[in-house]
Each structure stands twice: as structure tokens, then as C-alpha cells.
């Protein structure tokens, strides 16, 4: 763990400190490798900022209860992050058979849900059908085909229809973590 911090304006915070606090609370299932992946991909900022999507954000990818101009403490950032991770974990448990998943697969899928949101991981809009349809990753998870599920994480690299380098890198890291410890089933 490199203890990476966010770049850019405003005060930064140490991901390693946030991981220690969250893991010490004992409430999340996501393992240390998963927390490192999420934390390093999201970065950590004490001061609120407007993200590229036009949403006020602070801490580690937190968009809930953000007050522009109000700097957060380590404890506040860790509490927000833990709540957001628990939301992502609930998605994986409820919709992707998370309780049956190996820990690394669960942690990687939690990272994807944290980043994309539950609905975007489960379904996408098909122009051809004129409606939202089930994603391949969701289909494989429902079958308990963890290797196939993991190998579909790189399907999610676009933002507004444009592939982003940062998402390609993150999804490949998620895929690698997801496959760690799995055997061909």
C-alpha cells in the first residue's frame, strides 16, 4: 500500500489512514486490497470540489451530505466512506449473489458498484431494444460463474459513450483482483 493521496487543489488525506479506520470498525466485508483499489482510484480530499459530472464531492468519492466550503476530518471522511462502501456491498449481496462470492471477487465487484452505482452495473440502456437490459456481468453473477463475471469488468470503461483511460485502468485492476484466488470452475 502506497498511502496515495489525492492530487489537485485543497487539502488531501491519506488513504492508508482511512483504510485503517474503516477496517478497524469491522463493518465492511471488502478486504484491504479492495479498499486500496477504491481509495487509490478515487483519491481523498478534505475540501469539497465539483467533480467533472457537476456533483459536489468530498472525502473518497463521497457525494452525500457535502457542504461546499466545509472541510472534513479523518473521522468524518472515514464514516462517509464506510457508509458508501456498505451501500455498494449491499448492491453486490442483493443483486450479484455476493454472499456466495469469494472475498476478492466480492471486493472487486464492490469497487465497481462504488464507482458506477448499482443500477449501472446491473443494467444498461439498449438503443436497439429501446429499454434497459441486463448486463453480462449480472447474468454471470446470477449463475455463480465468477471467472466469467470477473472477465466482464472491463466492459465498463465508458463515460457518456467515450472510453476513458482511467476507467480502463481501474477496471483492469478490478478484474485482476476479482480473479485472484479463483480456479476455472
Curated annotation (Swiss-Prot):
PANTHER family xrefs: LYSOZYME (PTHR38107:SF4), PTHR38107
Effect of residue 51 to D: No effect on enzymatic activity
Its EC number(s): 3.2.1.17
Catalyzed chemical reaction(s): Hydrolysis of (1->4)-beta-linkages between N-acetylmuramic acid and N-acetyl-D-glucosamine residues in a peptidoglycan and between N-acetyl-D-glucosamine residues in chitodextrins
Annotated catalytic residues: 42, 51
Family annotation (InterPro entries): Bacteriophage_GH24, Endolysin_T4_type, Glyco_hydro_24, Lysozyme-like_dom_sf, Lysozyme_dom_sf, SAR_endolysin-like
Cytoplasmic compartment residues: 1-6
Name of the featured protein: SAR-endolysin
Transmembrane segments: 7-24
Pfam families on file: Phage_lysozyme
Source organism, top-level taxon: Viruses
Periplasmic-facing ranges: 25-185
Similarity comment: family membership: Belongs to the glycosyl hydrolase 24 family.
This protein's GO CC annotations: host cell plasma membrane; membrane
GO biological process: cell wall macromolecule catabolic process; defense response to bacterium; killing of cells of another organism; peptidoglycan catabolic process
Single GO term (MF): lysozyme activity
Membrane-protein topology: Single-pass type II membrane protein
Disulfide bonds: 13-44, 44-51
Keyword annotations: Antimicrobial, Bacteriolytic enzyme, Cytolysis, Disulfide bond, Glycosidase, Host cell inner membrane, Host cell lysis by virus, Host cell membrane, Host membrane, Hydrolase, Membrane, Signal-anchor, Transmembrane, Transmembrane helix, Viral release from host cell
Cellular compartment(s): Host cell inner membrane
Gene expressing this chain: 17
Function: Signal-arrest-release (SAR) endolysin with lysozyme activity that degrades host peptidoglycans and participates with the pinholin and spanin proteins in the sequential events which lead to programmed host cell lysis releasing the mature viral particles. Once the pinholin has permeabilized the host cell membrane, the SAR-endolysin is released into the periplasm where it breaks down the peptidoglycan layer.
Coiled coil: none
Effect of residue 13 to A/S: Complete loss of enzymatic activity although still releases from the host inner membrane
Domain notes: The signal-anchor, which may also be an uncleaved signal sequence tethers the SAR-endolysin to the membrane until the latter is depolarized by the holin, resulting in the escape of SAR-endolysin from the membrane.
Post-translational modification note: All the periplasmic cyteines of the inactive, membrane-associated endolysin are involved in disulfide bond. In the active soluble form, disulfide bonds are isomerized and only the catalytic cysteine remains free.
Amino acid at each position: 500500500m502506497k498511502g496515495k493521496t489525492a492530487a489537485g487543489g485543497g487539502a488531501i488525506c491519506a488513504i492508508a489512514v482511512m483504510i485503517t479506520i474503516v477496517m478497524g470498525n469491522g463493518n465492511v466485508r471488502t478486504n484491504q486490497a479492495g479498499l486500496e483499489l477504491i481509495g487509490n482510484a478515487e483519491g481523498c480530499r478534505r475540501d469539497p470540489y465539483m467533480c467533472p459530472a457537476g456533483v459536489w464531492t468530498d472525502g473518497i468519492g463521497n457525494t452525500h451530505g457535502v457542504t461546499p466550503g466545509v472541510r472534513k476530518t479523518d473521522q468524518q471522511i472515514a464514516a462517509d466512506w464506510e457508509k458508501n462502501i456498505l451501500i455498494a456491498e449491499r448492491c453486490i449481496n442483493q443483486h450479484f449473489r455476493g454472499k456466495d462470492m469469494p472475498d476478492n471477487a466480492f471486493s472487486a465487484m464492490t469497487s465497481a458498484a462504488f464507482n458506477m452505482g448499482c443500477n449501472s452495473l446491473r443494467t444498461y440502456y439498449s438503443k436497439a431494444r429501446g429499454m434497459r437490459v441486463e448486463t453480462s456481468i449480472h447474468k454471470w453473477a446470477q449463475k455463480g460463474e465468477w471467472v466469467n463475471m470477473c472477465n466482464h469488468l472491463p466492459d465498463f470503461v465508458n463515460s457518456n459513450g467515450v472510453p476513458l483511460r482511467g476507467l480502463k485502468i481501474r477496471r483492469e485492476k478490478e478484474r485482476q483482483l476479482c480473479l485472484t484466488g479463483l480456479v476455472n470452475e
